[in-house]
């Protein structure tokens, strides 16, 4: 029984682990030379409601990747504007650690293998065609290609290619597997009838910052610097994908987080203006390299799905991560990926597919996003455990807690404890 995962980001890696635990032969096809995709320039875990979701995953038996990010943490339990008890993992260490772990678990990694087309008939995928014209057969497929780029979208809906971590000019464009199967993808919107949204942060080389700022980042994990009044731009907040960070504090201040590099919590920032801020006189971008002029564009290719993560209209295709909804974040990708991988094996076995109830945060987020994405207003929102409208909902429903025993008990009451550890084949 062969599960093929297209895209090796956080969602794809999570899907691979749960499918493997359930007993499948698992293959990941990744177009670049790195796993984790945007996770290589991310780093924020366990902030606000993501803490709850992370502990739910651990209780469900799908906490492997959460534990690896904990292990690679540079800082734990830090606060920054609008966010509490965050963990910041080291983006320069995490990919190698995850890659070693997947190999150790017997997952087959196919790097620099870009999927170019699908062999699709009678509502079923028979195989994939790679860009080197290799044909790959499989039983069930999971699309975790994300929604970022390719270059044409970043040009049409953004400020052009910003030379981000996905490196489309070098490794080729992302394609939508669901669209190649004739499925109409959903597109996220922002104000002014514009599609897509800018990625919400950049990375600065920590070595290019002043000694004071660098030392404070190493010690505390966070530095907040005042933006000169003439350079404050509230309008940029509306273009951000990360609405949990679209707070006025992030327009009035430069917020830096220590994730190995210095994570700059804004979509982009002209370097000449950035260097006017004391301590940043010699600042240099390391992601995206053109962080002065723009950032990658996301949410232009979301597959319609049911709450078991199966793509509507294709009998043997699942989706996860941004491909599966207007979700933001590594934790959200790992949650959806874990469910997709597990259900892929259930489908092969002829079993009922698992749908998480709304009495746990993961189940509620998956169902709530699906419902909201049907409306135009809902497509202008983004869904994350960490903030914006969904974190408020978590608090109102009593789903948000940082008490591990309470979370584990909640999962156990539903008879879902260690469900992802069950071997099905």
What are these regions (language model features)?
Residues 18, 24-25, 30-114, 150, ...:
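Conserved N-terminal/central alpha/beta ligand/cofactor-binding core
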Residues 345-382:
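Active-site-proximal substrate-binding core of FAD-dependent oxidoreductases
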Residues 9-10, 34, 323-324:
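Residue-level detector of alpha-helix initiation sites
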Residues 109-249, 261-273:
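Predominantly flavin-linked oxidoreductase catalytic cores and closely associated redox partners
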Residues 2-27:
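N-terminal Rossmann-like FAD-binding beta1-loop-alpha1 element of flavoenzymes
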Residues 325-345:
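A conserved FAD-binding loop/helix module that cradles the flavin
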Residues 377-425:
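C-terminal auxiliary extensions adjacent to catalytic cores
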Residues 242-244, 293-327, 370-382:
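FAD-binding beta-loop-beta segment adjacent to the flavin cofactor pocket
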